[in-house]
């Protein structure tokens, strides 16, 4: 789909007059999805335990509370769920604070959005403190006007509420905002609500890339591909 920037510094994608962008963070701006698959195994190895084959897949679909309970019941009966949860949270924090890197092309894309006159916000399921520290360390935080988290909004991305809050904060209607997501369920939520959507590939992300591509208005394997639409 062709993109142009008109005389009023608005990005026009086909019939869409795009004024603002909402970025997901994990798997879109940050190369962080791997930790969510490996966290349980990393923790068990630190505890001197050998993780089972397929543990990452088992835990990936669980909430933090469910995963903690699973690790206690199957590996660490002598540790309390609170102790296990604290250990997992500490490892997760350290990863975001000191290890995670931006995805290739993230800063260039954010800069291009800013230079095109687009308003930029972010919507994430991760803790604010982790995300802000990781974005700051990678030089990305300054490009984002405001970050919205599921915990603070009170809804998961199965609801469009987090996108609606971000759009309202920018002063735009849904059809004036583009949402970038790497997960199918979140992208489907945004699309059903009337947002323009971009599906982003991540090797540790959505297993059904075919449906992600079919659902999105635009699908890219690399963030750099979007620069061709903006520059």
Please identify what each model-predicted range represents:
Residues 96-101, 125, 197-199:
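Short, flexible loop segments at the rims of nucleotide/cofactor-binding pockets, characterized by
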Residues 1-19, 111-114, 127-128, 132-231:
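Asp-based, Mg2+/Mn2+-dependent phosphohydrolase catalytic module
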């Amino acid at each position: 789909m062709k993109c142009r920037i008109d005389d009023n510094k608005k990005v026009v994608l086909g019939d869409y007059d795009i004024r603002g962008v909402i970025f997901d963070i994990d798997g879109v701006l940050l190369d962080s999805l791997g930790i969510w698959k490996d966290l349980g195994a990393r923790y068990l190895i630190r505890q001197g335990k050998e993780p089972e084959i397929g543990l990452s897949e088992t835990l990936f679909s669980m909430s933090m509370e469910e995963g903690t309970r699973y690790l206690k019941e199957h590996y660490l009966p002598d540790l309390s769920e609170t102790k296990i949860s604290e250990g997992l949270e500490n490892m997760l924090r350290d990863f975001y604070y000191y290890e995670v890197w931006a995805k290739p092309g993230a800063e260039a894309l954010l800069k291009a959005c800013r230079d095109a006159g687009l308003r930029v916000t972010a919507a994430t399921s991760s803790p604010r403190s982790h995300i802000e520290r990781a974005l700051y360390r990678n030089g990305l935080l300054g490009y984002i006007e405001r970050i919205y988290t599921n915990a603070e909004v009170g809804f998961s991305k199965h609801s469009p509420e987090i996108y609606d809050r971000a759009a309202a904060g920018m002063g735009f209607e849904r059809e004036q905002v583009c949402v970038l997501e790497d997960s199918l369920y979140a992208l489907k939520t945004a699309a059903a609500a009337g947002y323009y959507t971009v599906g982003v590939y991540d090797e540790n992300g959505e297993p059904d890339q075919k449906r992600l591509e079919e659902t999105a208005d635009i699908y890219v394997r690399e963030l750099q591909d979007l620069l061709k639409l903006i520059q």
